[in-house]
């Protein structure tokens, strides 16, 4: 038996990495009976049959899992936004952050296309990123001349997953980091201000102290797994200040003696962050139940 990590999955074949050696494996029939499928990122135990082939016997417990796209055991989720084409959006960023925290993922923010961004817009984005840094997020704003290898190797060890909407430059970023990957890229649609999907599956690529993965771009974000009363926990500053609200279940909207509303009034919480919280709270409160 060998133990390794699934780094690629295509048509029911799972490529497992064991210290740089790759094995094409398939899950035993037991998994089909349990209606359980391995995903990229899983740590598995498998039996070798023939050269570099085998059958998966066990999938070890996942510490976390992203549902769309399916990838597990993520150490850091890098939310990739572009400054322009498509334009930087704090609302979209906040939604990505909520998704990340709902899956217990550590998140950091990478903004691309600095070299294509007017100076005034660069200043505006830098000021917004300072707000996110004060909340507790690591952020970076990069252009075409920045050394991708230096950036990636400075990130935490383990599995790094790049996530973001289509067209923000995830595949381009990886091509600069590892030119031999030659990942497909596409220009954005001028009419829609968003990109076309070029990455169609998740694949892990080795880096100095772990792995890095590109993921298919999002055209929509799914909040079906999140309850309205959980959202406040995924806005980190609301969660922090909410600990001293009068009521433990305070949603920071109309409740009396709300510390979050007080911190908002004195400027310790950014108005746009609170507005995005309210929008998402109302959106989830009013969603229709799916049967």
Curated annotation (Swiss-Prot):
<keyword id="KW-0547">Nucleotide-binding</keyword>
<dbReference type="InterPro" id="IPR010914">
    <property type="entry name" value="RsgA_GTPase_dom"/>
</dbReference>
<feature type="binding site">
    <location>
        <position position="245"/>
    </location>
    <ligand>
        <name>Zn(2+)</name>
    </ligand>
</feature>
<dbReference type="InterPro" id="IPR004881">
    <property type="entry name" value="Ribosome_biogen_GTPase_RsgA"/>
</dbReference>
<dbReference type="GO" id="GO:0005737">
    <property type="term" value="C:cytoplasm"/>
</dbReference>
<keyword id="KW-0963">Cytoplasm</keyword>
<dbReference type="Pfam" id="PF03193">
    <property type="entry name" value="RsgA_GTPase"/>
</dbReference>
<dbReference type="InterPro" id="IPR030378">
    <property type="entry name" value="G_CP_dom"/>
</dbReference>
<feature type="binding site">
    <location>
        <begin position="112"/>
        <end position="115"/>
    </location>
    <ligand>
        <name>GTP</name>
    </ligand>
</feature>
<feature type="binding site">
    <location>
        <begin position="164"/>
        <end position="172"/>
    </location>
    <ligand>
        <name>GTP</name>
    </ligand>
</feature>
<protein>
    <recommendedName>
        <fullName>Small ribosomal subunit biogenesis GTPase RsgA</fullName>
        <ecNumber>3.6.1.-</ecNumber>
    </recommendedName>
</protein>
<dbReference type="GO" id="GO:0005525">
    <property type="term" value="F:GTP binding"/>
</dbReference>
<dbReference type="GO" id="GO:0042274">
    <property type="term" value="P:ribosomal small subunit biogenesis"/>
</dbReference>
<feature type="binding site">
    <location>
        <position position="258"/>
    </location>
    <ligand>
        <name>Zn(2+)</name>
    </ligand>
</feature>
<dbReference type="Pfam" id="PF16745">
    <property type="entry name" value="RsgA_N"/>
</dbReference>
<feature type="binding site">
    <location>
        <position position="252"/>
    </location>
    <ligand>
        <name>Zn(2+)</name>
    </ligand>
</feature>
<dbReference type="GO" id="GO:0019843">
    <property type="term" value="F:rRNA binding"/>
</dbReference>
<comment type="similarity">
    <text>Belongs to the TRAFAC class YlqF/YawG GTPase family. RsgA subfamily.</text>
</comment>
<feature type="domain" description="CP-type G">
    <location>
        <begin position="63"/>
        <end position="221"/>
    </location>
</feature>
<dbReference type="GO" id="GO:0046872">
    <property type="term" value="F:metal ion binding"/>
</dbReference>
<comment type="subunit">
    <text>Monomer. Associates with 30S ribosomal subunit, binds 16S rRNA.</text>
</comment>
<dbReference type="InterPro" id="IPR031944">
    <property type="entry name" value="RsgA_N"/>
</dbReference>
<keyword id="KW-0862">Zinc</keyword>
<dbReference type="GO" id="GO:0003924">
    <property type="term" value="F:GTPase activity"/>
</dbReference>
<dbReference type="InterPro" id="IPR012340">
    <property type="entry name" value="NA-bd_OB-fold"/>
</dbReference>
<keyword id="KW-0378">Hydrolase</keyword>
<keyword id="KW-0342">GTP-binding</keyword>
<dbReference type="InterPro" id="IPR027417">
    <property type="entry name" value="P-loop_NTPase"/>
</dbReference>
<keyword id="KW-0694">RNA-binding</keyword>
<keyword id="KW-0479">Metal-binding</keyword>
<feature type="binding site">
    <location>
        <position position="250"/>
    </location>
    <ligand>
        <name>Zn(2+)</name>
    </ligand>
</feature>
<keyword id="KW-0699">rRNA-binding</keyword>
<keyword id="KW-0690">Ribosome biogenesis</keyword>
<comment type="function">
    <text>One of several proteins that assist in the late maturation steps of the functional core of the 30S ribosomal subunit. Helps release RbfA from mature subunits. May play a role in the assembly of ribosomal proteins into the subunit. Circularly permuted GTPase that catalyzes slow GTP hydrolysis, GTPase activity is stimulated by the 30S ribosomal subunit.</text>
</comment>
